[in-house]
Amino acid sequence: MEEGITLATLDSHDCPVGSRMTSFISSDGPPGIEISLTKADSLEHGLRGLESGDIDVLAIPAGMIHGNMLGVLQAGCKIVGARTPVRPYPVLVSENKLQYQPKSAILLCESKLGRRQLRRARRGIRVLSPEAYADIEGRADTPSDPISLTKWMEELRESGDIDGFVVARGLYDKCQLVTRRHSLLPDGLNEGDPHFIPPAYSDLIVFVARSRFPKSISDEISEKEGETAWWVQNNFVGSLDAKS
């Protein structure tokens, strides 16, 4: 058994990093190292912990790294691995599948990519962002917190004002919704089902460590599929940023 490490986790509303790492350590059998888990309050807090040596690795949703890589590098750190996404696909929260929505249906979706895919898959229905819907209906500003926004949309669905909405699976679970959900998958379960691409970095966890962190240790917690997902998505999104 190698010397143990301290791994800090940082959750987002749609990526439960802490529970994922706890499950990995407990159910997959102990890796070749002893891992002690702790929590970070923010990316900045985690980077300070790495700089001071209080922690050895920071596990964080990949989406939090986007736009913050310079800060990671300035802290003398780098991405040393990633975990394969478990549930990256968003869900449609509605009594009906997308194909069976009435022609007058109103669906809400925050993601611009998601709205485009919904309109392509089911022409004729109204697919709006929560902000656009609130503006059209003359309602108060939408909640800024993802959990509050999800609950707000569920209240609209329950009252019959809308027919459904799309959220990350992690948000659905965190809000403890019991309404029927329909996963928007890249390959439909049944013939004729529409195909959807999940948003970049969905449910993807990356590991941040100091620049000279031993590869033999990062290999114990990282997965090749996760590393590939990170490399592909980060390079793709980075190329879009460079063109904008």
Enumerate the predicted regions with their spans:
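Small-molecule-sensing regulatory modules
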Residues: 1-52, 115-116, 120-244
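Short beta-strand-centered segments that line the small-molecule binding cleft or hinge
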Residues: 46-89
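Residues that line or immediately flank small-molecule/substrate-binding pockets and catalytic motifs
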Residues: 62, 96, 169
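Short coil/turn connectors at secondary-structure junctions
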Residues: 76, 101-105, 162
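Small-molecule pocket liners
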Residues: 76-77, 86-97, 195, 201-207
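Flexible hinge/capping segments at coil-to-helix
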Residues: 90-107, 121, 125
